[in-house]
Amino acid sequence: MGTGKKEATRRAKGGETGNGFGNIRVKGVNFYRDAKKVKKLSMYKEGRAKHNARGEEVQAATFQSKEIPNARIDPNRRWFGNTRVIAQDALNHFREALGETKRDSYQVLLRQNKLPMSLLEENNKIPQVKVVETESYANTFGPKAQRKKPQLAVGDFAELASAADESQQDFEAKKEEDNSWKVDGWSQEAKEAIFHKGQSKRIWNELYKVIDSSDVVIHVLDARDPLGTRCTSVEQYIKKEAPHKHLIFVLNKCDLVPTWVAAAWVKHLSQDYPTLAFHASITNSFGKGSLIQLLRQYSALHPDRQQISVGFIGYPNTGKSSIINTLRKKKVCKTAPIPGETKVWQYITLMKRIFLIDCPGIVPPSQKDSETDILFRGVVRVEHVSYPEQYIPALLERCETKHLERTYEVSGWSNATEFLEKIARKHGRLLKGGEPDESGIAKLILNDFNRGKIPWFVPPPQAEDMENVKFAAGEGRLGEMKKREIHEAPAATETAEETKEEEFKGFDD
């Protein structure tokens, strides 16, 4: 009896189920080949056609029958409907209107019809066609010309000259971009590891996560140097890979520059994307209402979505987290006057339909930027820089002497060494033997430079239409350029000229 119990237990553990007749061979059934295997082997035999004794084909091979099968057209009313056609003139007009609309940064595409847009858009790339080999000059322009009219892209010599100029400009821009690392035949200089901050794979992964999760992307720029803190490569990526996402420029720290400088930069950047001037402060902000109103408009453009996400990208230390705190009226993101405070992306709820995404600062690699440019943009922390006194001469060239004299209450220096020595002796920063602590004072000055205690800014480009447009001081908002443009107004012109000619005295601490 004990043996029987063990045998029953062993069978149960072995997984044997059923009545025990599963492995019994039935007569007439192939035991070694199943139906799938038999079908596969028969397919190998059917590969050739069958012929009779006279060599005539009796049965065609698989998929090689010459008999036409009976076809049947799907009954659909669209076969009998009108066909939509368009003339060439109307197509050209539509193509021009489409191009003008795409170039306008203040127009948004709400709905797109099912049209072959690839056929309507003009391809900027020149196809690699060997025209001379396919159509010779004699067959095109000579007495034996076979075409009535040569296929030219221009109509007269003026258009040909303008097309040649545009082609030359594009070629020079591309050449400068490709050969930016070649400077007078010298090779690229090795940079310190600290100047490669913001370029790690982790930071780029955070950036791509923010871009993929955002419906509206806000590019935060520093009002003192907007072009220096502009990520052109990220803009091109969004324009190419995600054209359905909306991009906005926010000119932060506009309180550190004069009003006419901020207004000129807003007008210049508005040619590419919608631009707003902003001052991040929980208690005393500027541009907050305009930004929230703009986000509400983008939210209204997508009524089918329950909410939209707004991502903040840009260089480190440009004030992305501070703008989010300003919009929420409380500290929801960790901020600091040093770069690299935000490590990972963070979701913040602004309202029921709008969410904000904070992103770490990104620094696109560029061979044109020197170590001085990277340091002055606030990308790296000054305390980690070796020999900070070597950057003081460039700082003296970028800042005016009167601003430095008023900030540090020293005067009468001829070079950077004397400037550091005077400030060190005034503040009592001396080493053994009465030697001035140049390194410590240089770090102090660089921190003041990045944090806005020393007034400086990059002048805006003087556009051709800027001469006829004046900005009245103290009227409207910087984001609303149409309300601030005053044409042929004598009183406003005099006020603007007085404001621009007035000496910029800096800012109070």
From Swiss-Prot:
- CP-type G domain boundaries: 204-365
Q: Which UniProt keywords apply?
A: GTP-binding, Nucleotide-binding, Nucleus, Ribosome biogenesis
Q: What Gene3D superfamilies does the database record attribute to this sequence?
A: 1.10.1580.10, P-loop containing nucleotide triphosphate hydrolases
The superkingdom listed in its UniProt entry is Eukaryota
One GO molecular-function annotation for this sequence? GTP binding
Q: What does this protein do?
A: GTPase that associates with pre-60S ribosomal subunits in the nucleolus and is required for their nuclear export and maturation.
Q: Where does GTP bind?
A: G314, Y315, P316, N317, T318, G319, K320, S321, D358, C359, P360, G361, I362
Gene Ontology CC terms: nucleolus
Q: What is this protein called?
A: Nucleolar GTP-binding protein 2
- Quote the biased-composition stretches of kind Basic and acidic residues, using this chain's numbering: 1-14
Q: Which gene encodes it?
A: NOG2
Q: What biological processes does GO assign it?
A: ribosome biogenesis
The cross-references to CDD domains, in alphabetical order and at most eight, read: NGP_1 (cd01858)
Protein family per UniProt: Belongs to the TRAFAC class YlqF/YawG GTPase family. NOG2 subfamily.
Where in this protein does the record put region Disordered? 1-22, 480-509
Recorded hits in PANTHER family, A to Z, give:
GTP-BINDING PROTEIN-RELATED, NUCLEOLAR GTP-BINDING PROTEIN 2
Localisation: Nucleus, Nucleolus
Organism, per UniProt?
Yarrowia lipolytica (strain CLIB 122 / E 150)
> One Pfam family this chain carries?
MMR_HSR1
Q: What is its main location?
A: nucleus
